[in-house]
Amino acid sequence: MSSELLISNSKPRPEGLRKLCEGETVILPRDITPSKCAYFLKQNIVFISYIFIHIIITIILNRLALSAHGNTLIIILAALLITISLFLLLLLPYLSCSRYKLRCLDDDCKFKLLAEVITHKPNMDLSTWDRIAYDMNQFVYDRRICADRSFFYDGSYCYQVFKKLVATPYLVNSNMNSIYADLEMRSNGATNINDSGNSSLHIELGTYIFKALAVFRNSVDKYWEDKYPEMGVTV
């Protein structure tokens, strides 16, 4: 895929830029490929090409099965390919979801994501996640998990993966004691494989999860305080 993330001296699309600090502009795949559909096609071009070829073969076999030259073997193969084709088509939406993105990340990438949240202190304003998405794209590329610097389309994608990694399991229950208890359980050697793609979370990762959530919660509280001071939100 040709899209690249650059800290710019280049000539990017002006409407998509997000200035994160004075004199610096981050370019994300969103700025190079405004269409999410086009981005998805580029990201999964190999898999989609395979599905396309598979469907063509399936159609040919089905025509043979329906013709006078059809035999039992061809009919069985045609039925099998139809089933596989349906499965592959149903798999396509999964490739665009945050759960799949998270499963692509190794433990180092998860540590990096948590460290970025602690460093940059993002909030509910999705533009505050753009810098994190940029840094993560570079890191994932360096780890050879992605062929180019376009793993996260924009900050909102990065935020969704962060929620899958930490926010969804922990923020369901706001009782901080339960978080400590869970971290203690993990430190005793427990491992957990859940539907968010978190496998064998070590105590070190659990500690970063706790820190990142605390930073994120404080940033969110400050965001709402600044936006609606009359609400009197307190941390």
Swiss-Prot record:
Residues 1-44, 94-235 are cytoplasmic. Changing L86P: In strain: CLIB 388. One of its GO terms (cellular component) is plasma membrane. Changing R103T: In strain: CLIB 388, CLIB 410, CLIB 556 haplotype Ha2, CLIB 630, YIIc12 haplotype Ha2 and YIIc17 haplotype Ha2. Disruption phenotype: Cells lacking all 10 proteins of the DUP240 multigene family show no obvious alterations in mating, sporulation and cell growth. InterPro entries: DUP/COS. It comes from the Eukaryota. Keywords: Cell membrane, Membrane, Transmembrane, Transmembrane helix. Changing N9D: In strain: CLIB 95, CLIB 219, CLIB 382, CLIB 388, CLIB 410, CLIB 413, CLIB 556, CLIB 630, K1, R12, R13, YIIc12 and YIIc17. Its main location: membrane. Changing Y180D: In strain: CLIB 95, CLIB 382, K1, R12, R13, YIIc12 haplotype Ha1 and YIIc17 haplotype Ha1. It is a multi-pass membrane protein. Residues 66-72 are extracellular. The chain crosses the membrane at residues 45-65, 73-93. It is found in: Cell membrane. Interacts according to large scale protein interaction studies with BZZ1, SRB4 and SUA7. Belongs to the DUP/COS family. This is DUP240 protein DFP4. It comes from Saccharomyces cerevisiae (strain ATCC 204508 / S288c).
